């Protein structure tokens, strides 16, 4: 009964299946003709292409409703290079190719398929069939696989409604085709008796695709770029034609293209179709096959076997290259290297041979490689041996690497050479566990223990190889991803290396190896190191850097780890900055950026805050397409911050992005420095270069870096050792130093100061230079105490340099020969095609470099000579290729760009010290009978290669150069010959007149430049002589006509100024002067020369100078006389005032310049220029408006600003040749065009051949410029031109030192009641008649101390004591004069210079310190220190200068307190000479910390009377000048003079009323619109000339506070 029921159900199921879904009737045989076409060429119909036509008859027997049996017969194929056409080529137009019997038998083997719902669900092949043959048969079955209707459960209501109307139907469904399991879109159209089914494949929605990719693991993920980069996904369309429910024809068309900059450059195309021939009953059954069931999807089994062989070597189960006999491989390699040896010079053909050798080596077993070694390598010349070594390393298979390591251990390859070869192994295309294990064994071998470069290269290479199979990259290998156990294995190995390391370098190397590996599981180990405070800082920083390759794998995890590190102020600043730097490359989201900005705004360490701001700002400005989202987020987040960094911060990050967003291509240069207060050297310096080409992002294409920890200790120790031979003979100075040290020690004892000992170990101090290439650490160069000691011991004997050893090393003649073959890059991608052949898209750049030469150094008594004789030869070819492969045929298209350079060179350099001169000579020699060649060749090539049937001898491909006809017409022939300097130069070729990169790739071009010398050697000589300074008379300097009418001052002061000027010149001329002569002679063959003399005459203080330059050269083309140039420059600067009073009273405050030049050959041009560097009208008003009397430090700081010269007046008279006049005119036109929007001009009639120029810079912001130029015919005015912030010159005495301290130093101010520390913490603390320690070097070997006290209880005047290691200096002000005592003895003002003391003006004295200086005006002590000096080794009321605001109050015995009184008392020096004012000290109102760490606010106000609106430094901190705007309905009013406002981020704390004048103008007027725009960024200076509309009282802030 059960069997009856089952049979009934089966019958019902069969009956229910619609006949429409049955393509073939059971028990019938169908014959179809199959045609397949391969086309490779350019994406244009007008060029030739390589085309292969394959045809056969297909017998198809429908056994039942589900199974069909198939067999191919009458197989033939033809291939040729013919023009492209939309039609199928006729078989007669192609060359018939012979198919071997072996291949024909394979293709004729039967196969069986199961059909379900019209689709091929299972396939069975003969057990004797080959994989490539199976894929060919799949392509035919692929044409019979068709779903005639949408699955009912997937049809929506509209489709169901349309089902009733068969005229048209569309549906999407996932379906397995030859190219993968992807979404397919069906369209069904009824045309009479015919039904046409069309389906297209959507490759964006694939579940699986049989594809591989190698060599892409060095790229980074760029989400904003096209995911496939240059490769465009294939376009595949199927068309099925049914007539009366029978399949008449089925065709598939696929196109594969490569895009560059959005344009197709090469393409490959496949077409396949089956055409119905006949239908009949089955007469002769096709043999049923019973092989394993397989899918219709392309089988990558053959590719998998190849990959396994590359990765596992002889341990692979199957050798896919076994068919090629050993003798045949050796013969091919022998022929390759024979041809390379015959090529004396490297050519593109040599590069092609190297690429072939690499391909052959990848096919070799260990035995075959041994045969190559004994047969070829041992008998070859050195060049071929070196090339064989590098090609084996580039091949990068397990067998080639094992073979190389075997010879490393036998030392037949030197360890240094082995280390070099391992750099190529790092880039292997086929990384595997087997290769990684080999490298780790090498790194741990006794050989590597002896040779550090080899060991380092082995570890770094092992890490890079591990990344290839154990980390997520863009590679798509066929082997399964590494298991967790495998990852844990290598993490354990690398961490064991770290734990076993004894030195810092060893630990750094272990972490760089782990960083190269990029294993996700390593993050847990790295986090432990980063968070372990017991680890050295350099190790923790290196662990942060080791996370770099995980940015795409686990960005959120890295952010979670590094954000707390960055925010934790207990961590060192350089660690925090490194964490931020690494975190930003994970492209954080806005919440993370908000945390970063919040930390920046509340940051107490200014280095960290400034670095953070710069990083955010640079990412916000980036045009890198891969940072687009991050740039948007950074721009949003920066809108809400008020933080502005200090200008002098050295820790910074900057980038230079150069990108084309349309092409998704460009480059970016990054530069970052990380400084710390305790070091003069940067803790970290990085310079990197990253690229994006066609959306492919190489984040760390190249990077060089330097990191160090306490390396200053190494330098100091080394200098101490080198100074052993220096004998000190000055006993007096020695006694003075001992006296100073004793006084410093007494201060330490009396104040109970605990020395600030830096926790640094000089033995652990180290520095590391590293090179990173393609995201891999490539080279690590450590420098530590041991390395320095080795060098010192080698070249220093008994405290003196061992000159003999050094001379022996330098004077040895050194011949060298270098040959290196390498692939700059190699990438490969393989995808299936609908014709059953794999399509390989590859790019590579094989290169060979050879350098033969000799270098020698000859040392003489007073000179040295270097001779370098080399012949470099470079050849390289960039290959972009699309290739189809079958055992019977290989076809494709490639674009080649080749370059070659061969240039013999000889260079000689001599340095000789003669009696009165230093002579340096450089000589460049072009050898005789030698040719220099530079050639470039580009061409697209279509190729076909058909192997011979009899043997596997290598057959050259049949190539045909193809080109884009339209682009080719744009090329032009070049054939030019020159003869110059006795050298024959030939330039010839065929190049594009206008080109783009796609045009270059699609056209044939060639260009060759040759330089040949058939006569004697041609020498080019440059000789520089520098004479000694000689005394001379200054009377020869004449300032005759130097003042022009345009230089006259207002108020008729010009005559007085001129008299003052000439009197000053006469006084200077009465003094002794000095002169110097420098000559430069350039000599070339054929009496070509350029000789220059530069003569300088100046006084001792460089107040007046005369510079003359004479030049002459040999006549050039169209010249019949020697060309000469004679110039003279006179310069005189005014006296440098040291007080405002001197500045006001000084009649002459300008710098005068006079310049004359005369040049030409037969006709001479002459120009005379008088220039005056002066103060503008606004700047002079500023000086006149200084109504209050300033003294001391504020006076000097104001003097620097008041003495700025911000305007230059130039008057030029000229007599020019027409050619010179035209050149100057064009330059002038360019300047006007560049500043089109800010220029105005009018026609005038001025004096002929005379030009007047006035240029003035706005003195406050120094970012805007006005310029007026008057020519004989026009007056041109440029207003408000924005320029980079400039440093204006100032004539104030010693101004340069002060400005340097302001920009790069740290400053502390102390007066009788308030202290502003080095770290900008302001607090109140009263000084008494007992000394308070202002600042002191509190290291174990102190060098200075600065103390201050009140002269008496009721006085505001102070007395300052400076103790240096040499002496004790006491300074006080008495009767407006400074009284200076050194070691208790009064010193006259004329003797102060020998004690490094200087008096500026009447109210300021400067005392130099070993590092820094002290400025004192009687009331305020200002101590300037370098911003990177003595972190945690300074103490005193001025703090520790460590950049942190949170730890200023460290008492004398080195513990932190929040009680300012306790802090102050700890630095009181109590003795019998003073009376402690306990009442004043204990009174709490005298203490106030204006930087509260908990509330993070700055509410201090300036208590000094002299801090004016013109004090730029304080203005930048608190107040800024702005034009006040009042807006009404129809008018806008502007304040005529600038009004003070609190800078952004601050609020007014105190205000005062001031009457302000306003001028009003209509809102619609041009001036109103312009002034509104200018007032947003600067003060509007032009308003002074407008009438006053009204006066109004306005509240002006006098002090600001930040909340």
Curated annotation (Swiss-Prot):
- What top-level branch of life does the organism fall under? Eukaryota
Q: List the disulfide bonds.
A: 1308-1438, 1330-1474
Transmembrane domains' residue ranges: none
> Localized where?
Secreted
Protein's UniProt keywords contain Signal: yes
Entry annotated with the keyword Transmembrane helix: no
Main location per UniProt?
Answer: secreted
Give the signal peptide, or none: 1-15
| Phenotype reported upon loss of the gene | Simultaneous RNAi-mediated knockdown of vitellogenins vit-1, vit-2, vit-3, vit-4 and vit-5 increases life span, causes accumulation of neutral lipid and an increase in lgg-1 foci in the proximal intestine; however, does not affect fertility or pharyngeal pumping rates. Expression of transcription factors pha-4 and daf-16 are increased.
GO MF term list: lipid transporter activity; nutrient reservoir activity
Cite the record's tissue specificity text. Expressed in the intestine of adult hermaphrodites.
Q: Where is this region: Disordered?
A: 1492-1513
Q: Which GO terms describe its cellular component?
A: extracellular region
Vitellogenin domain mapped to chain residues: 24-685
Q: What is this protein called?
A: Vitellogenin-5
Organism listed in the record? Caenorhabditis elegans
Record lineage: Eukaryota, Metazoa, Ecdysozoa, Nematoda, Chromadorea
Could you tell me the gene encoding this protein? Answer: vit-5
């Amino acid at each position: 009964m059960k069997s009856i029921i089952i049979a009934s159900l089966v019958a019902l199921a069969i009956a229910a299946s619609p006949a429409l879904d049955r393509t073939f009737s059971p028990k019938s045989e169908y014959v179809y003709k199959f045609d397949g076409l391969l086309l490779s060429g350019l994406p244009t119909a007008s060029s030739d292409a390589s085309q292969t036509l394959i045809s056969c008859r297909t017998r198809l027997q429908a056994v039942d409703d589900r199974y069909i049996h198939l067999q191919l017969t009458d197989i033939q194929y033809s291939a040729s290079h013919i023009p492209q056409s939309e039609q199928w080529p006729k078989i007669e137009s192609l060359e018939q190719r012979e198919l071997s019997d072996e291949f024909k038998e394979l293709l004729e083997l039967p196969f069986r398929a199961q059909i379900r719902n019209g689709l091929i669900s299972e396939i069975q092949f003969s057990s004797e069939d080959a994989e490539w043959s199976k894929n060919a048969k799949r392509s035919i079955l692929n044409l019979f696989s068709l779903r005639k209707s949408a699955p009912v459960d997937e049809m929506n209501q509209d489709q169901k409604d349309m089902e009733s109307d068969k005229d048209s139907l569309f549906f999407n469904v996932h379906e397995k085709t030859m190219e993968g399991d992807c979404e397919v879109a069906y369209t069904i159209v009824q045309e009479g008796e015919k039904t046409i089914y069309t389906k297209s494949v959507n490759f964006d929605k694939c579940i699986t695709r049989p594809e591989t990719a190698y060599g892409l693991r060095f790229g980074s993920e760029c989400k904003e770029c096209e995911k496939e980069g240059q490769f465009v996904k294939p376009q595949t369309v199927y068309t099925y034609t049914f007539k009366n429910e029978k399949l008449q024809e089925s065709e598939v068309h696929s196109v594969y293209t490569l895009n560059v900059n959005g344009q197709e450059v090469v393409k490959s195309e496949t077409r396949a179709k089956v055409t119905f021939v006949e239908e009949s009953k089955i007469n002769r059954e096709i043999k049923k096959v019973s092989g394993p069931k397989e899918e219709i999807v392309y089988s990558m089994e053959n590719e998998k076997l190849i990959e396994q062989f590359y990765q596992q070597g002889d341990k692979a189960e199957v050798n896919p290259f076994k068919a090629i006999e050993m003798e045949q491989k050796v013969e091919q390699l022998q022929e390759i290297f024979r041809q390379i040896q015959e090529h004396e010079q490297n050519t593109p053909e040599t590069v092609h041979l190297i690429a072939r050798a690499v391909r052959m080596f990848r096919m070799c077993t260990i035995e075959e490689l041994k045969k190559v070694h004994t047969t070829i390598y041992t008998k070859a010349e050195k060049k071929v041996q070196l090339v064989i070594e590098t090609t084996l390393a580039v091949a990068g298979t397990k067998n080639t690497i094992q073979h190389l390591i075997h010879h490393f251990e036998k030392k037949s390859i030197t360890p240094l050479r082995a280390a070099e070869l391992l750099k190529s192994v790092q880039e292997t295309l086929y990384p595997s566990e087997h290769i990684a294990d080999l490298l780790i064994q090498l790194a741990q071998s006794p050989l590597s223990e002896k040779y550090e470069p080899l060991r380092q290269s082995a570890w770094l290479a092992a890490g890079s190889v591990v990344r290839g199979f154990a980390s997520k990259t863009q590679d798509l290998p066929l082997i399964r991803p590494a298991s967790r156990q495998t990852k844990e294995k290598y993490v354990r190995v690398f961490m064991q290396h770290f734990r076993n390391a004894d030195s810092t370098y060893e630990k750094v190397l272990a972490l760089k190896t782990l960083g190269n590996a990029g294993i996700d599981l390593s993050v847990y180990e790295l986090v432990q190191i980063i968070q372990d405070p017991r680890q050295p800082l350099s190790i923790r920083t290196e662990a942060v850097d080791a996370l770099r390759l995980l940015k795409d794998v686990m960005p959120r995890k890295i952010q979670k780890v590094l954000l707390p590190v960055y925010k934790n102020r207990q961590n060192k600043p350089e660690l925090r900055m490194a964490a931020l730097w690494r975190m930003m490359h994970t492209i954080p989201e806005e919440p993370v950026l908000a945390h970063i900005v919040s930390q920046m705004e509340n940051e107490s360490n200014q280095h960290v805050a400034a670095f953070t701001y710069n990083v955010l700002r640079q990412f916000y400005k980036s045009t890198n397409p891969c940072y687009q989202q991050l740039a948007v987020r950074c721009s949003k987040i920066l809108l809400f911050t008020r933080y502005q960094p200090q200008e002098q911060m050295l820790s910074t990050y900057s980038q230079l992005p150069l990108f084309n967003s349309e092409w998704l291509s460009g480059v970016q240069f990054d530069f970052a420095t990380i400084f710390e207060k305790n070091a003069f050297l940067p803790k970290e310096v990085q310079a990197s270069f990253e690229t994006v080409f066609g959306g492919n992002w190489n984040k760390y294409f190249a990077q060089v870096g330097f990191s160090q920890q306490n390396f200053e200790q190494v330098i100091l120790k080394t200098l101490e050792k080198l100074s052993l031979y220096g004998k000190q003979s000055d006993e007096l100075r020695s006694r003075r130093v001992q006296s100073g040290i004793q006084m410093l020690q007494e201060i330490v004892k009396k104040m109970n100061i605990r020395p600030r000992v830096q926790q640094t170990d000089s033995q652990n101090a180290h520095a590391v230079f590293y090179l990173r290439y393609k995201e891999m650490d490539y080279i690590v160069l450590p420098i530590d105490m041991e390395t320095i000691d080795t060098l010192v011991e080698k070249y220093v004997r008994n405290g003196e340099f061992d000159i003999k050893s050094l001379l022996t090393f330098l004077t040895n003649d050194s011949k060298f020969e270098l040959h290196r073959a390498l692939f700059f890059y190699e990438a490969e991608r393989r995808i299936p095609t609908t014709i059953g052949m794999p399509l390989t898209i590859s790019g590579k750049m094989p290169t060979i470099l050879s350098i033969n030469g000799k270098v020698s150094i000859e040392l003489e008594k007073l000179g040295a000579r270097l001779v370098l004789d080399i012949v470099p030869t470079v050849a390289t070819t960039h290959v972009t290729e699309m290739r189809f492969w079958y055992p019977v045929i290989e076809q494709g298209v490639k674009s080649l760009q080749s370059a070659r350079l061969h240039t013999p060179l000889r260079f000689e350099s001599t340095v000789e010290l003669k009696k009165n001169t230093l002579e340096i000579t450089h000589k460049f020699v072009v050898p005789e009978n030698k040719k220099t060649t530079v050639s470039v060749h580009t061409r697209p090539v279509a190729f076909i290669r058909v192997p011979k049937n009899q043997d596997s001898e290598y057959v050259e491909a049949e190539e045909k150069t193809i080109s884009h006809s339209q682009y080719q017409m744009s090329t032009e022939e070049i054939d030019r010959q020159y003869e110059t300097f006795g050298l024959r130069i030939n330039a010839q070729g065929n190049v594009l007149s206008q080109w783009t990169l796609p045009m270059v790739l699609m056209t044939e071009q060639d260009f060759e430049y040759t330089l040949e010398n058939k006569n004697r050697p041609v020498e080019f000589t440059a000789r520089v002589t520098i004479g000694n300074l000689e005394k001379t008379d200054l009377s020869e300097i004449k300032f005759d006509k130097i003042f022009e009418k345009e230089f006259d001052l207002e108020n008729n002061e010009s005559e007085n100024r001129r008299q003052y000027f000439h009197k000053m010149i006469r006084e200077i001329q009465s003094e002794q002067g000095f002169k110097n002569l420098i000559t430069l002679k350039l000599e070339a063959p054929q009496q070509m020369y350029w000789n220059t003399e530069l003569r300088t005459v100046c006084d001792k203080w460089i107040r007046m100078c005369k510079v003359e330059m004479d030049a002459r050269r040999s006549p050039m083309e169209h010249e019949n006389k020697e060309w000469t140039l004679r110039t003279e420059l006179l310069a005189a600067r005014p006296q440098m005032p040291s007080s405002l009073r001197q500045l006001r009273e000084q009649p002459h405050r300008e710098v005068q310049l006079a310049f004359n030049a005369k040049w030409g050959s037969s006709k001479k041009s002459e120009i005379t220029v008088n220039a005056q560097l002066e103060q503008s009208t606004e700047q002079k008003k500023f000086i006149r408006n200084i109504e209050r009397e300033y003294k001391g430090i504020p006076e000097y700081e104001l003097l620097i600003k008041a003495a700025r010269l911000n305007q230059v007046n130039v008057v030029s008279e000229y007599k020019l040749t027409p050619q010179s006049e035209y050149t100057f005119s064009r330059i002038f036109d360019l300047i006007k065009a560049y500043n089109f929007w800010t220029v105005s001009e009018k026609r005038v009639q001025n004096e002929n051949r005379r030009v007047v120029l006035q240029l003035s810079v706005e003195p406050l912001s120094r970012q805007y410029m006005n310029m007026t130029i008057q020519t004989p015919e026009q007056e041109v005015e440029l207003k408000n031109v924005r320029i980079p912030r400039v440093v204006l010159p100032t004539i104030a005495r010693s101004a340069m030192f002060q400005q340097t301290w302001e920009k790069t130093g740290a400053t502390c101010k102390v007066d009788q009641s308030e202290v502003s520390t080095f770290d900008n913490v302001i607090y109140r603390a009263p000084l008494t008649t007992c000394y308070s320690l202002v600042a002191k070097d509190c290291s174990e070997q102190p060098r200075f101390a600065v103390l201050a006290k009140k002269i008496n209880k009721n006085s505001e005047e102070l007395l300052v004591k400076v103790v240096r290691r040499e002496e004790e200096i006491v300074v006080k002000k008495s009767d407006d004069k400074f009284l200076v005592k050194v070691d208790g003895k009064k010193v006259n003002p004329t003797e102060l210079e020998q004690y490094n003391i200087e008096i500026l003006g009447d109210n300021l004295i400067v005392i130099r310190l070993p590092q820094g200086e002290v400025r004192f005006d009687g009331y305020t002590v200002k101590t300037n220190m370098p911003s990177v000096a003595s972190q945690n080794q300074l103490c005193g009321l001025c703090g520790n200068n460590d950049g942190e605001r949170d730890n200023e109050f460290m008492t004398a015995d080195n513990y932190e307190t929040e009680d300012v009184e306790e802090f102050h008392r700890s630095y009181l020096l109590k003795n019998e000479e003073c009376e402690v004012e306990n009442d004043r000290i204990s009174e709490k109102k005298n203490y106030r910390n204006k930087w509260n760490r908990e509330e993070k606010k700055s509410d201090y106000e300036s208590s000094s009377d002299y801090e004016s609106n013109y004090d730029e430094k304080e203005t930048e901190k608190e107040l800024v000048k702005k034009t006040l705007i009042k807006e009404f309905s129809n008018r806008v009013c502007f304040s005529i003079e600038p009004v003070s406002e609190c800078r952004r981020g601050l609020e007014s704390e105190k205000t005062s009323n001031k009457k302000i004048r306003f001028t009003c103008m209509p809102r619609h007027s041009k001036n109103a619109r312009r002034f509104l725009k200018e007032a947003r960024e600067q003060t509007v200076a032009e308003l002074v000339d407008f009438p006053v509309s009204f006066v109004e009282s306005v509240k002006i802030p006098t002090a600001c506070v930040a909340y």
